[in-house]
Curated annotation (Swiss-Prot):
Induction: By bacterial infection. Residues 1-19 form the signal peptide. Residues 20-44 form a propeptide. Hemolymph and fat body. It comes from the Eukaryota. PROSITE patterns: INVERT_DEFENSINS. This is Defensin-A.
Length: 87
């Protein structure tokens, strides 16, 4: 029992030592990341953004039924890729 306690303590110490900051290298990476993020502008985003209401119908109708059952509904059906729950 004492062996496992010492082993757990040594593992904890090893994890703590390896989790220490690396130094200036990480700060430089963060500075370049901030510069890259400043370069991105909302106007630069091209294309139309599309949000799927439910991905469950793309997988299968039984997933839609399971989703509706988990919401305490009687059943559910898919229409044009959207899951509708019925009472």
């Amino acid at each position: 029992m004492k062996f496992y306690l010492v082993l757990a303590f040594l593992t904890l110490c090893a994890v703590a030592v390896t989790a220490l900051p690396a130094g200036d290298e990480t700060r430089i990476d963060l500075e370049t990341l901030e510069e890259d993020l400043r370069l991105v502008d909302g106007a630069q985003v091209t294309g139309e953004l599309k949000r799927d209401k439910r991905v469950t119908c793309n997988i299968g109708e039984w997933v839609c039924v399971a989703h509706c059952n988990s919401k305490s509904k009687k059943s559910g059906y898919c229409s044009r890729g959207v899951c509708y729950c019925t009472n």
